[in-house]
Regions:
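Cleaved targeting-peptide boundary
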Residues: 24-31
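Bacterial N-terminal signal peptides
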Residues: 8-19
């Protein structure tokens, strides 16, 4: 009797596991990752020197349109540091080397940027050869979900920048 129960349980587990495995998205069809920082000296469009703003990100897009990933951004404004942790909700690759990534802020140390706010940026992978120009990035923007989705779904170049970054950007179309 115990053997029959075991086989019945095994059959139920198999019946539940196989459809779940088939429904899971395959590997990513596009991805972007990197660890970068940049310095934007004066004069610039912002009127303040932007110094060493680190950004680490990993985003993947699957054949069914779903995305996964996260990014962490550290911002220093007039000597005060702020940290943002963001879950990726949108990601698109344009021109083969440019990724637009956006998501919802999960945690923020900036009292003016609450969790639930959206954040986005775009990066340029300019190659790995010694003669390659530096990788580039826009700054991180903040706003609502509609602005985030519009940003990711627009092929437009950044309004400000992009700026050369230190570090490495990898974009896979």
């Amino acid at each position: 009797m115990h053997i029959r129960s075991f086989f019945l349980l095994a059959a139920i587990v198999a019946a539940l596991t196989v459809p779940a495995a088939l429904a899971a998205p395959g590997g990513p069809v596009a991805s972007a990752s990197g660890g970068i920082h940049w310095t934007i000296p004066l004069p610039n469009a912002f009127g303040v020197e932007v110094v060493n703003q680190p950004l680490a990100f990993n985003a993947r897009k699957y054949a069914d349109g779903s995305v996964s990933g996260r990014f962490e951004y550290h911002q220093i404004v007039e000597g005060t540091s702020f940290d943002f942790n963001v879950d990726v909700t949108c990601m698109n690759v344009y021109d083969g080397n440019r990724a637009k990534i956006g998501g919802v802020v999960k945690s923020s140390s900036d009292p003016t940027i609450a969790p639930g706010t959206f954040a986005w940026f775009q990066v340029f992978d300019n190659g790995e050869a010694q003669q390659a120009t530096p990788d580039q990035s826009s700054l991180v923007g903040f706003g609502d979900e509609a602005a985030n989705e519009a940003f990711c779904n627009s092929p437009n170049l950044p309004r400000f920048g992009p700026w050369d970054v230190q570090g490495n950007v990898q974009v896979q179309p």
